[in-house]
Structure formats: C-alpha cells, structure tokens
C-alpha cells in the first residue's frame, strides 16, 4: 500500500492552487503513475526574490457589497508574489484572494489576524490579481499592498 501511495504522490500533475492544500501538490494521474513519470514543480529560489514598489489598496474602510479586482503586472517576471502592509476583514463574510490571471486562487485571507508584511504564495508568471469580496454588513480596514516581489 505504501509503495502505491508514494508512487501516486510522486507522479501527480502539479496544480498551483493545490500546492499548499494537499500532500501531492496536484492531481493524481493514472498515466503518470503507470509509466512512473515524475513532474517537477517549479519552486523558486528564495534568494532571487526582488522587491518592486507597487501600491494598490481598497477604500478604508471598504464598502459593503464589493466585488473588486486589482491587477498587478510586472513584464518578464517568471514568479510573482504580493506583499501586504495591512489586511483586515470581517471574519468569514468578507475576504480577499490572490489569484493567477486565469483565476486560480493561490492565497486566501479573511478576518483580522494577519501579520503586517504578510506575503501571498507565489504565482508562476508575471500577473497577479487581488480580488476583494464583501457582504452587506460590517466593514473593516481592507487591504494595502506596498510592493510585489518577483523573480525574472
């Protein structure tokens, strides 16, 4: 059983949005498992991240019934992540996601217990989308992005 389990994990197809959610970091592939095809997930080198000033922010406090997209782009970036100066939302009802331009969620935030300087998970590519969704009651500060981090 252990051998089969390990083979399924090692030969899964990498999926960015599953990277920190499941042990295989992707979708099981019977074809890959049968042929023992192992796919490497592109992990960026921590020492290569560069800070680029880019400021975007919600209204403070944000409004009720908001569904707002903010796009961050850095031409030529291979990897990108978002660094927040502040994050504060109504728990469970209002939230913010960081997504790829295709809409895959890489980070999710709700509530008020986020440290100053929180950083999203990375995105493979040069574009990140910050998506703010709020309900009809209770508002908080919202968010402020101070800069992005990229690897060229």
List each model region and its residues:
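Domain-level representation of secreted and single-pass membrane ectodomains enriched
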Residues: 42-152
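C-terminal subdomain of the subtilisin-like protease fold in secreted/lumenal serine endopeptidases
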Residues: 1-48
């Amino acid at each position: 059983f252990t051998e089969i389990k390990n083979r399924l994990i090692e030969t899964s197809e990498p999926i960015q949005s599953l990277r920190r959610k499941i042990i295989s970091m992707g979708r099981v592939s019977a074809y890959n498992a049968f042929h023992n095809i192992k796919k490497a997930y592109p992990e960026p080198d921590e020492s290569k991240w560069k800070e680029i000033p880019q400021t975007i922010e919600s209204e403070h406090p944000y409004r009720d019934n908001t569904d707002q997209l903010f796009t961050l782009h850095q031409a030529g970036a291979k990897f990108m992540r978002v660094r927040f100066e502040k994050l504060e939302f109504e728990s469970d009802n209002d939230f913010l996601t960081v997504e790829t331009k295709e809409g895959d969620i890489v980070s999710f935030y709700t509530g008020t217990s986020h440290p100053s300087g929180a950083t999203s998970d990375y995105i493979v590519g040069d574009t990140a989308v910050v998506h703010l969704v709020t309900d009809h009651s209770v508002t908080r500060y919202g968010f402020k992005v101070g800069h992005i981090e990229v690897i060229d």
